[in-house]
Amino acid sequence: MSVIGFGKTAEGALITAAMLSTRITSATVYYNGQSITFGSGHGFDTQPFDDCVCAINAGTILGPLATLINQIYESATDDPSVSTALSGADFTSMKTTSDSQMRRGTIQCEDTKRYLFLRTEAQGTTITIDFGAVWIGGKPRQQPVEQHLEFDV
């Protein structure tokens, strides 16, 4: 995608999975789709980007009620166990049957630490929900699109 205007071309984006589409069936905590029990890593590296979007797709509940707590965490290293929550970057919702939703939030990566994690926590007694999320990173790469020429006539 390119945007032309003001004598510059701005382009550049990357889309990567924050959590692959999965069916959550128990009360658990994930960091970018990985259970913290099974190791660290898989953080979204913000170094190449100026800003990013985290888009969350919570599908239909196949049970009575569940609470999904999604929050963005930041860390200087690719280790979610030492990450801290970003203030105001949370998506908490009560879900009922046939109530699917799509949520998104924009984050200025220049103001955060290097790695971002989507922390997803499912709470409830009978949980079955289809869930997925993506990170979309963007950085304008600016290039001149015009040159001023002068002619001696």
Regions found by a protein language model. Name each.
Residues 50-53, 110-127:
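Noncatalytic modules at the cell exterior or secretory-pathway interfaces
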Residues 1-19, 123-153:
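C-terminal interaction-tip segments
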Residues 100-109:
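Exposed aromatic-hydrophobic patches
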Residues 69-73:
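Beta-strand signatures of extracellular beta-sandwich domains
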Residues 85-96:
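Solvent-exposed serine/threonine-rich low-complexity stretches and specific carbohydrate-binding patches
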Residues 39-44, 55-62:
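Short amphipathic, basic-aromatic surface patches that mediate peripheral association
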Residues 1-47:
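Solvent-exposed, flexible loop/coil segments flanking beta-strands in beta-rich domains
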